[in-house]
């Protein structure tokens, strides 16, 4: 886990519990099989950005995901019931976060997707994306975050806002 604020965007890697206690906003990037290890109480009331993607090759098969009955971010929200989970940064390779951004209004500006059941988490994510040079595609509630997951057309490729809107709208629940 990493900690940081939207004021200075400073981040540092620390132990899970320490990060959770110190964070104003937390970023969760763990294999899904490790969700149960994420501390719950220290993250209560905080925005938690979920960058996770389901890879059954790494995570083992998770029936609810395989059947399209759950989303990765929904599983995290269920584990952190008093946190404000937002799907974020899952459809970009980490190296590109610092290289693919461009000023607002730039033609063909890259878009990143988000979804959350908490408007303040969605707003935070959109602001962060913009500060880093990306447009936002807000898919609404976490129940729609599957549209950004692996093997869907909104996942993993560089897309403009218009392209991502079209691709996520056309996505099938089961790949």
Question: What feature does the model see in each segment?
Answer:
Residues 47, 52-103:
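Rossmann-fold NAD(P)-binding glycine/threonine-rich loop
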Residues 29-30, 51, 88, 115:
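Short, well-ordered coil/turn residues at beta-beta hairpins
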Residues 5-9, 66-67, 102-106, 154-157:
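Short, hinge-like loop/turn segments at secondary-structure boundaries
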Residues 31-34, 92, 118-120:
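Short beta->alpha connector loops
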Residues 107-175:
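Active-site-lining helix/loop region of Rossmann-like oxidoreductase modules
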Residues 1-25, 29-34, 41-42:
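Conserved N-terminal Rossmann-fold NAD(P) cofactor-binding segment
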Residues 13, 84-88, 137-141:
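General beta-strand structural signal in soluble alpha/beta enzymes
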Residues 21-24, 32-41, 54-70:
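Rossmann-like adenosine-cofactor binding region
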């Amino acid at each position: 886990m990493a900690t940081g604020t939207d004021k200075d965007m400073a981040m540092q890697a620390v132990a899970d519990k320490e990060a959770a206690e110190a964070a104003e906003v937390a970023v969760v990037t763990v294999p899904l099989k490790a969700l149960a290890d994420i501390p719950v109480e220290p993250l209560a009331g905080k925005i938690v950005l979920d960058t996770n993607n389901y890879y059954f090759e790494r995570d083992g098969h998770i029936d609810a995901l395989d059947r399209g009955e759950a989303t990765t971010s929904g599983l995290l929200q269920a584990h952190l019931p008093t946190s404000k989970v937002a799907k974020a940064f899952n459809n970009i390779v980490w190296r590109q976060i610092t290289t693919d951004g461009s000023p607002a209004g730039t033609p063909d500006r890259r878009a990143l997707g988000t979804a959350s059941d908490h408007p303040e988490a969605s707003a935070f994510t959109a602001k962060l994306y913009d500060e880093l040079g990306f447009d936002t595609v807000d898919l609404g509630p976490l129940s729609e975050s599957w549209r950004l997951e692996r093997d869907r057309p909104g996942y993993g490729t560089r897309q403009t806002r218009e392209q991502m809107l079209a691709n996520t709208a056309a996505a099938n629940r089961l790949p």
